[in-house]
């Protein structure tokens, strides 16, 4: 429960309160006592004692006409019968009010947050596995792939980083379930849309940066994308960063000026990988030792080193790190199937140019024969990925490419595929039915030297079409049908 008086106090303290508007009159304080027993931004879940948040570009006045709620919070006075708390920024208001409503659960958990263009989910699972070794399985996880609030039951995540109200509720549930630590991915959109406003993380990790999510719906420029991701730095008590990442200089400069304790990793830093072979690697620095992970590729080993440094800052021992990394399983990341002819089928969530480039390089290194890539690109977001995908394909002439559908949403998947192909000088294959594309790819293999890469969806069991999730068998099940 939270009192209206508390809500007003929170907003005033954040310089985010304009007035209360009711029946044509304006108030700087409310003369009556009001208690809210629920917060919501979904009109279908609102009740008579709910504090409702009217947010979103498409919010309409008619949503409030028959709304069952006590008050609503908005940047705009809709002049309806329901009293309104008018604010400058409704998303910031929701974040701070939710934190108070749920009794500041973020202060009772040890939190580790990860950002970067690629590797967030893999690193999140690495970190959870290490911390579980340290705390006996009491680590909650919020990732692109899955969410768990009790360490046992997992469910599919709707967003990489949930809306602030949902996020604070999840943190509170994790505490109730006995969790002591939380590992979560923080997207650039989370900072752009204030989903993590007011949160300070115990440890923040910045893995890498490359152009992605650039377009009219998400970030207009790379600068905006990078700036939003960089907000994790000033909202972390300790920070881990990749010294080999693009634009590292400003990260280093900002950390120094803000006097934030930190650790760097990479070839030109104290913490580095000095030996790498298959699933095994050796590190030097503050977490020096020999480690094994279940994923191929040096980039995965670099993510493991990043999480080793981050979890060490939370108290994990070298033994915890060693044992956790060895056991970590990441759903939808380089998931491996073997066809009857011995060919390998790799299923991976790689959904931007940098992730695809790293994935292709690893598979090329281990397979000398036919390499078939099944790939699509999302509609109505991340438009810059199409050029990036085309450039990766052009760079790797060994790839036999089948372009297909991947969450085309309100765009024509053939137009998306054509755009990818426009950046490639050789002829590509098209099969817009994703399952048939996978069938065709597997049929092209003959021996253990051959491999198929199915990129983009990982464990997703839906296709986004016209704004709705439509059932899809899933890449793994589709591939298994034709092994």
UniProtKB/Swiss-Prot annotation:
Binding site for ATP: 116-122
Disulphide bonds in the chain: none
Protein role: Catalyzes the addition of an amino acid to the nucleotide precursor UDP-N-acetylmuramoyl-L-alanyl-D-glutamate (UMAG) in the biosynthesis of bacterial cell-wall peptidoglycan.
Natural source organism: Lactococcus lactis subsp. lactis (strain IL1403) (Streptococcus lactis)
InterPro entries according to UniProt: Mur-like_cat_sf (IPR036565), Mur_ligase_C (IPR004101), Mur_ligase_C_dom_sf (IPR036615), Mur_ligase_cen (IPR013221), MurE/MurF_N (IPR035911), UDP-N-AcMur-Glu-dNH2Pim_ligase (IPR005761)
Residues given in the record as UDP-N-acetyl-alpha-D-muramoyl-L-alanyl-D-glutamate binding sites: 43, 160-161, 187, 195
Annotated GO MF terms: acid-amino acid ligase activity; ATP binding; magnesium ion binding
Gene3D superfamilies with a match to the protein in the record: Mur ligase, C-terminal domain, Mur-like, catalytic domain, MurE/MurF, N-terminal domain
Post-translational modifications reported in the UniProt record: Carboxylation is probably crucial for Mg(2+) binding and, consequently, for the gamma-phosphate positioning of ATP.
Family membership noted in the UniProt record: Belongs to the MurCDEF family. MurE subfamily.
Gene: murE
Nucleotide-binding keyword on record: yes
PANTHER family xrefs: MUR LIGASE FAMILY MEMBER (PTHR23135), UDP-N-ACETYLMURAMOYL-L-ALANYL-D-GLUTAMATE--2,6-DIAMINOPIMELATE LIGASE MURE HOMOLOG, CHLOROPLASTIC (PTHR23135:SF4)
Catalytic activity, EC: 6.3.2.-
Enzyme class, first EC level, given as a word: ligase
Protein name (Swiss-Prot/TrEMBL): UDP-N-acetylmuramyl-tripeptide synthetase
Cell compartment(s), UniProt: Cytoplasm
UniProt keywords, alphabetically: ATP-binding, Cell cycle, Cell division, Cell shape, Cell wall biogenesis/degradation, Cytoplasm, Ligase, Nucleotide-binding, Peptidoglycan synthesis
In-chain residues carrying the UniProt-annotated modification N6-carboxylysine: 229
GO biological process: cell division; cell wall organization; peptidoglycan biosynthetic process; regulation of cell shape
Pathway: Cell wall biogenesis; peptidoglycan biosynthesis
Keyword Ligase in annotation: yes
GO cellular component: cytoplasm
Stored Pfam families: Mur_ligase_C, Mur_ligase_M
